[in-house]
Amino acid sequence: MTQTDRDAENGRDREKDREKEQQRGVKRPIMPAAVPEPVQEQIQANFIVVIHPGSRTLRLGRATDTLPISVPHVIARRHKHPGQSRYEDKCLLREGLNSADSNEQRQNGLKMVDQVIWSKKMSNGVRRTPVSAEQARLYNRQIRPAVLDPNSKVSWTNTSHHPEYVVGEEALYVNPTDCYSVHWPVCRGRLNLHSGSGGSLSAVMMDLEHIWTHALQKLLQIPLKDLKYYRCILLIPDIYNRQHVKEIVNMLLVKMGFSAVVVHQESVCATFGSGLSSACVVDVGDQKTSVCCVEDGVSHRSSRLCLAYGGSDVTRCFFWLMQRAGFPYRDCQLGNKLDCVLLQQLKESFCHLDQDISGLQDHEFRTRFPDSPVLLYQLRLGDEKLQAPMTLFYPAAFGIVGQRMTSLLHRSQGDAEDPHDEHFLLTTQSKQDQSSKASADRKSFPKPSSFEGESSVCEVSDRSSLGQDLDLGHSQAECLVGGAETEETPSALLSRKTAMSQFEGKALGIDKAILHSIDSCASDETKRKMYSCILVVGGGLLFHGAQEFLQHRILNKMPPSFRCMVESVDVITRPKDTDARVCVWKGGSVLACLDTTQELWIHQREWQRFGVRMLRERAAFVW
């Protein structure tokens, strides 16, 4: 056999071996699936839905809409079994009001409010005319309602066809005698989980899905089968529950069928909606108040603060004050949802924060309920209209005892679906810091030539100990996380721990919360920016005179060192002359049109494959 024949034979053998390997398959190292880079594509804004879920009101609309559609965030579900007990989430009542110390705390809080009212003069330099509740009560007790119309032309929601559920305004007007339970799925900015009927996570998520799909179909005229062509921008609180956000995103993408989702924070979107680059954002909602410092589209984590009170607490306090003044509508009950709607309207109509309005004034209001005549009431009030909104600055007057009223941002508890979370990063960073420090120490230590052998032994020992360090158990990992936290500057760590222990146990007034939030910023320049622009959004502080009142309190309480640095303290309560209640939603619609938003979209297939990891990779804030 010639050399040429042998080469040809060897070539055929190699080809056969290659075919056998292909048939058997070649073992390759298993690489973890990488999160894909966001795809740049042209998106039409009229196919983007912006959703802002509040505790009391759901606001949603297309990004091209001028204003959102507002719907009461409530659902009434038909009982599944005959004789099932009726359950109803309360609108104005809450835990902590029935404590033995509640009344005393409320009275002490109102005394502080009265002292502030009497201590401040009116703009003309004259002190306010003192008015006692007894003066108003003598008049109001004599009032009897006048019948304007025997038929109110308001009817209960028709449930004769036994719908499984009704939502929004219809849910408010379900007859209490019907076999329906009423649920508000969001409470104080979080999912309303409780031990009662309909309080499980799955039940609350079902309520959310039904309310939102109803609003999309009936109010935005978007068929559910077309949601695969739409995208969604979800606005969440600054201090959020990660598990709740994860469940809502899963509902939007998997159950409802949106093609993609962007999740962003309310405070940042508030600055977008008001056209500001930097501001201390104060969001006074119905059940919670959030304070956060935003700079160039970034929310400072250390400045986030959530107060567990809002406009509904002011409404309840206003009702107590009116009762003390002989409120003529004597059948009014805080447990009745229609009475709560009436009290909310009275608060918005009568209350103010204008020190120049003093003395007794006469008012009138109407009641219009199903199966009842339209009644006209006369009402005389004095300082009650000023006292009620001032409780936002003296929350002890709410009489809430035994509840955590202030929340700061806590470290993530981790998620089983996202192993490379904050805990992992902190642990890795700590180990890298320790390793680099040890290496630097070895390099800086002089090594005599006579001990070269020992030096090599020491290096081997160091490497082996480092390998053991990488195999730390769970408890050791927790220690490292804590150690990483202490690697922060001692002053920052001390101030954060002190703040948590000092403030979470008691209720802060809005002005004190603003001062604390700004003081948590890292630099004096950032603090100066925040003092210069305080943006108030939400519907809880929409009172006449609120802008001047808040500005006066901030100026009086801000640190003296900043008074010369800050040219003026601007408090903005009506950004661009728009309704402060829709400012956050407007910011979401602006976000939909930004070029940088292209990088934030989480697509349905990506979510199904990678899950909550996508929020960490794509969210515009630190997840």
Swiss-Prot record:
Q: Which GO terms describe its biological process?
A: cell division; DNA recombination; double-strand break repair; regulation of DNA-templated transcription
The record's Gene Ontology cellular component field reads: Ino80 complex
Annotated stretches, region: Disordered? 1-29, 428-458
Q: What is its main location?
A: nucleus
State the SUPFAM superfamilies in the record: Actin-like ATPase domain
Binding of ATP occurs at 283-286
Q: Which SMART domains match?
A: ACTIN
Q: Does the keyword Oxidoreductase apply?
A: no
Basic and acidic residues composition-biased segments: 1-24
Compositionally biased intervals (Low complexity): 428-438
Q: Does the keyword Nuclease apply?
A: no
Which PANTHER family did the record assign? ACTIN
Query: What family classification does the UniProt entry report for this protein?
Result: Belongs to the actin family. ARP8 subfamily.
Protein name as catalogued = Actin-related protein 8
- Which species is listed as the source? Danio rerio
Underlying gene: actr8
